[in-house]
Swiss-Prot record:
The tr-type G domain, residue ranges: 381-550
Cellular localisation: Cytoplasm
Keyword Cytoplasm: yes
Comp. bias regions, Basic and acidic residues: 34-43, 59-69, 82-94, 110-131, 167-181, 230-240, 248-261, 276-292
Keywords, in A-Z order: Cytoplasm, GTP-binding, Initiation factor, Nucleotide-binding, Protein biosynthesis
Organism of derivation: Lactobacillus johnsonii (strain CNCM I-12250 / La1 / NCC 533)
Full protein name: Translation initiation factor IF-2
GN (gene name): infB
Amino acid sequence: MAKKRIYEVAKELDIENKIVVKKAQDLGFDVKSHMSSLDDKQVSKLVDSLKSTNTTPSTEKDSKNSSRKEKAKIKVSVGAIRRRDNKNEHDNRHGNNKHRNNNFKKQQNNRRENEDKKTTSAKPAARDLLNKFKKKQRAEASELNAQTEASRRKWHQEQNPQRSKVKKVENTRKPKEEKLEGAAAVKARVQASQKPVGPKIIKPSPARNKAKRPTVKKVEPIAPVVPAPQKEETKPTRKKDFTRKKREVPDYERERSEHSDKARRRRNKKNKRINQSKEVKKQPTQRKERPLPETLVYEEGMNAQDLGKLLHREPAEIVKKLFMLGVMTNQNQSLDKDTIELLAAEYGIEAEEKVHEDISDIDTLYTKEMEESKASKHQEKRPPVVTIMGHVDHGKTTLLDRLRHTNVSEHEAGGITQRIGAYQVRIDDRLITFLDTPGHAAFSNMRARGAEITDIVILVVAADDGVMPQTIEAIDHAKSAGVPIIVAVNKIDKPGANPDHVMEQLMKYGLVPEDWGGDTIFVKISAKTGKNVEELLQMILLQADVMELKADPDQKAIGTVIEARLDKGRGSVADILVQQGTLKVGDPIVVGDTFGRVRVMTNDKGRRVKKATPSTPVEITGLNDVPEAADKLVVFDDEKTARSVGEQRAKNALEKQRENVQHVTLDNLFDTMKKENMKEVDIVLKADVQGSAEALQQSLEKIEVEGVRVNIIHSGVGAINESDVTLAGASNAFIVGFNVRPTNTAKSQADSEGVDIRLYNIIYKVMDDVEAAMKGMLEPTYEEKVTGNLTVRETWKVSKIGTIAGAFVDNGYVTRDSGIRVIRDGIVKYDGKVASLKRFKDDVKEVKQGFDCGITIENFNDIKVDDQLEAYEMQEVPVK
């Protein structure tokens, strides 16, 4: 017995599966889903039950479709109808319209009669219900068509108000107008010939702009859909007074036309926006060209990109200009000075090379600041700096004591000034800064420094003693510094004083008194009693007014160290004379080779001050080391810069000091012994084993030449390291190595400090060289030069060849003719020659730093990974 499934029954009755399943379950059938099967009796009973219900599936489904159509506001797309029915309009114009319509009606009537025959088999209740539904749908369709036509006409009139008035069209009108009117005629014909159609209409596939025949699904008991008229390939022709008839457009055509019309409008809007944006993009934004600078300030080594930024031009333009000038370059290639100047001439501007200032050269910076201060417009009057100079015990400190109203000379050792003292004296609301210099012959450098930083020199000469050697020296210092001299003839109150004799003596040195027709001021004073001291001060102020001494207090402070010392409680202390600008507490400073920040600042009376103006002597603390007298003081913007400059200057000074120190070597041993009257020759001895070290030490200590013997200050086993070099440098000794090598760090340190390292592998050769050097008969003919160092990274053992070492050149180079040493843990394992040198599979003459190579050593195969290979050459040197 054949069985049917639930979904087959639902398909025949055009009812949803869930309704059939529900009904079958109500009838008591064992049904779980639409895939459950029923026999013929169950099917017959189920069908009768479904047909007897008041609700018909097709009616229910059609009501959904009609309600969906009621909600949609359809606008007929004139363009879609025009394209689809263009050929039908052509037939109408040629008289074939009637014949085609008659055939179409006959086909439609035949289909309808066939459908009626099929539906007669249904029961009367279903037929009546279906007829009611058809009538209702036809009425709804007619009403919807009328609304659509009215809205279409209204829209057409709004868009083309003039075209809607035209009824007769000539053959010369445009195809677009023909298609618009043809659409209206097609719609009228469809409305006239259309019969009621069934509710079940399957929409065609949403292919745009394609006039395909709509697909119709035949569903019982629904009437077939009216097919679209066939199109012909003949070219349409039109009569002059021909007016098309309107036809009604089917629902499916309206829906499809509406969709295509909406899509076209969306595309048009989108394309319009895209075109507008493209038009905006097509308009190139013109870059405002910046003018060329008047002067090109360049640095040698700049490339096209750097020059483009300075010239306000693109790098490509710079490269093009250089190409036209015959210079092939790219944007990143460095250019030399001549090329940059040539480019500047091409642009018609001047070129000026930027000079880099070495900020560690504070002497140059000091001079520059002094020149800028003199050219400044914000200059103010400053106190004169006066240096008191003269022979020892002529009364310089006594005069200063009188000026300061203190007893200074009693505190000096032996009555002689031991250091420069700086003091300020107030006279008639004006300040004068005095510097007291030593008068002893041993302090000539201090007198010279005092003359360099002063404005006026007061030369003190004792009336009872006359001109002395230090007096003449003071005159020379003052003249070399270009400083005016005021002569103070002191001790006129003493018996035997003869001021005129002093004036006569000074005339020999170019100091002619004003009273005798010269230009040198002479004042006869007594520092002890204070006679004419006031007149001396007035002369100082008068000379200062003539000189117009000025300074800029707003710029960075610069000064000079008068004296410096190390204080137990305060650290480094420096006496500073501020020459330009204002020095403040907290300023980062560099003084000579030292640096720091001003922590405490005190004046000449011992009081703390926060700032020091020009021509003010102060005492400062906060330096990392003690500077030297006459060192320059410069203030920097920040402490970081001051620290870097100070450290760099200290490093440069140390290197310079090492260059000047001459260490003892075997080459200069004999000369050093004679020059310094040496009694011992200090040697640092290093050997590979303790036995060799002891034997060498005993042999060397037996050597004695002309009362000079060898002193082994240190003996050890192993490679020569940094501590050995440091010890030899501090002891003015040289290093002897027996079968050992120095480390790379120790070798670099020895080269920088000038420590001599001699390496041997024969014990009697050590004895001969040291003894010959002490006798002055050392004649070296060859000198070993290390050319490179290698590290063994891998080894391979090959029969008939031996061990091949894969090595990396750490520094220098190795050649095929080089001597080679195998060093393991600082001990020389073998000293021989290179047997072969290869790079990959090719024999090479040389391998430089940073490359790998394969190397074999003559008569030696005990090479291990991490062994150090030292390549060297023997060079002949002249006898020293």
